[in-house]
């Protein structure tokens, strides 16, 4: 892991300090990233377009999870993200209906609630908006039976490089941008 990335990694670790599961939405680049994340919590991941050298049983093109009564679908690239949910389901999820869709690819954070589906792109913790290495954003899902909450949080600023991220919260029915 590059030294510059190691300096940022502590902020990522703090953000995931109390999580039960880590969902990685692709652009893993190297399996050691999964190894590091797995030291903190179990990891479920999807393959990204920058993962040509990642050959790992923990990674798939699409992942489906059932957590506390909620169905979560993960896929790296689901563009355009603002297409109707039914069209995204048809094109990327074989028509299956999740409660939550977790995506990546753009490195731009996004949270939307449409047609009863929460759509989350966490951005990137260390390469936000495809800028040079710096702190960015992560998404946190809080799932309990009958209750779904989510937020996208900024990890801070890297010295000399601002964090371009936008924070969001989801209270179970509405997404609120915080910036």
Task: Label each residue range with its predicted role.
Residues 1-4, 29-33, 50-56, 79-85, ...:
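Active-site environment of divalent metal-dependent phosphoester hydrolases
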Residues 44-97:
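Helix-adjacent hinge/juxtasegments
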Residues 44, 83-151:
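Conserved beta-sheet core of the metallophosphoesterase superfamily
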């Amino acid at each position: 892991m590059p030294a510059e990335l190691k300096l940022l990694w502590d902020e990522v670790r703090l953000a995931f300090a109390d999580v039960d599961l880590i969902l990685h939405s692709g652009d893993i680049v190297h399996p050691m990233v999964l190894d590091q994340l797995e030291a903190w919590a179990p990891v479920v991941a999807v393959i990204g377009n920058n993962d040509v050298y990642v050959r790992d049983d923990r990674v798939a093109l699409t992942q489906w999870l059932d957590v506390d009564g909620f169905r979560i679908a993960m896929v790296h690239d689901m563009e355009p993200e603002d297409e109707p949910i039914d069209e995204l389901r048809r094109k990327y999820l074989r028509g299956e209906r999740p409660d939550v869709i977790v995506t990546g690819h753009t490195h731009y954070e996004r949270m939307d609630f449409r047609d009863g589906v929460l759509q989350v792109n966490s951005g990137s913790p260390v390469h936000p908006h495809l800028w040079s290495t710096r702190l960015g954003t992560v998404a946190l899902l809080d799932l309990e039976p009958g209750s779904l909450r989510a937020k996208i949080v900024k990890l801070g600023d890297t010295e000399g490089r601002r964090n371009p991220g936008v924070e969001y919260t989801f209270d179970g029915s509405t997404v609120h941008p915080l910036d």
